Amino acid sequence: MSLTDTIRNTFVPIHREGYPFIAGFFVVSLMLGWLWDPLFWIGMVLTVWCIYFYRDPERVTPMDDDLVISPADGKVSFVGLAVPPAELDLGYEPMTRVSVFMNVFSVHINRSPVRGKIDKVVHRPGKFLNAELDKASTENERNSVLIESPHGKIGVVQIAGLVARRIVCWSNQDDELSVGERFGLIRFGSRVDVYLPSDATVRVAVGQTAIAGETVLADYGTERGEPVVRIA
């Protein structure tokens, strides 16, 4: 095994979105250290925290079009019926919604819950209420992604929160996504909502811990053989 492989297998990868922030914290730590030694160590603690925040571990994703996989790490905070945001053009009838709340200690990379093509990406400005509140779905700043999957259209909504003031989505309209593929992140904790077609059966409960790219949120009830997975 090479030195590069050893380092890769020992340390959790850091997402490129974090590089400027990590470098900034480190430079500020050095500058503060010139003024007073204890300030350097305080700065280094913050730098390490920033590295931890932007960690991007590999995930083993089930490659099955009949499954809907969690787009975020965190706690399942809502399972039930809700009207999807108007910008998704999914109609005004309630759909099954599964919400995953991310705290400041969660991995903040968001992954596609299904394989499919992005129909649209719409950003909406708004408030920064506690993302655990139900009204955050309609009142908070959000980024809505509509995906045409093998089983129909699925809405994925990144919602800003009380601390999270920055939603990042690097995927665009007409992009093809693989299930479990990274498509964005929300800095410093928030929530991701998934709006499911009526024939999907939810497989999680409120309070359950979800892992992005691995936890099955729902399925379509089709009999399956041996699972096929992808590590990414």
Swiss-Prot record:
Protein name as it appears in the record: Phosphatidylserine decarboxylase proenzyme
Reactions this protein catalyses: a 1,2-diacyl-sn-glycero-3-phospho-L-serine + H(+) = a 1,2-diacyl-sn-glycero-3-phosphoethanolamine + CO2
Site description Cleavage (non-hydrolytic), residues in chain: 189-190
Subcellular location per the Swiss-Prot or TrEMBL entry: Cell membrane
Organism: Brucella melitensis biotype 1 (strain ATCC 23456 / CCUG 17765 / NCTC 10094 / 16M)
GO terms for cellular component: plasma membrane
Cofactor dependency: pyruvate
InterPro entries: PS_Dcarbxylase (IPR003817), PSD-A (IPR033175)
Cofactor note: Binds 1 pyruvoyl group covalently per subunit.
Enzymatic class: lyase
Membrane topology: Peripheral membrane protein
Pathway recorded for this protein: Phospholipid metabolism; phosphatidylethanolamine biosynthesis; phosphatidylethanolamine from CDP-diacylglycerol: step 2/2
Keywords: Cell membrane, Decarboxylase, Lipid biosynthesis, Lipid metabolism, Lyase, Membrane, Phospholipid biosynthesis, Phospholipid metabolism, Pyruvate, Zymogen
Modified residues (Pyruvic acid (Ser)): 190
Molecular function terms, GO-annotated: phosphatidylserine decarboxylase activity
Chief site of localization: membrane
Function: Catalyzes the formation of phosphatidylethanolamine (PtdEtn) from phosphatidylserine (PtdSer).
Isomerase among keywords: no
EC numbers, comma separated: 4.1.1.65
Sequence similarity: Belongs to the phosphatidylserine decarboxylase family. PSD-A subfamily.
Subunit structure: Heterodimer of a large membrane-associated beta subunit and a small pyruvoyl-containing alpha subunit.
HAMAP family tied to this protein: PS_decarb_PSD_A (MF_00664)
Active-site residue list: 190
Free-text description of this protein's post-translational modifications in UniProt: Is synthesized initially as an inactive proenzyme. Formation of the active enzyme involves a self-maturation process in which the active site pyruvoyl group is generated from an internal serine residue via an autocatalytic post-translational modification. Two non-identical subunits are generated from the proenzyme in this reaction, and the pyruvate is formed at the N-terminus of the alpha chain, which is derived from the carboxyl end of the proenzyme.
GO biological process: phosphatidylethanolamine biosynthetic process
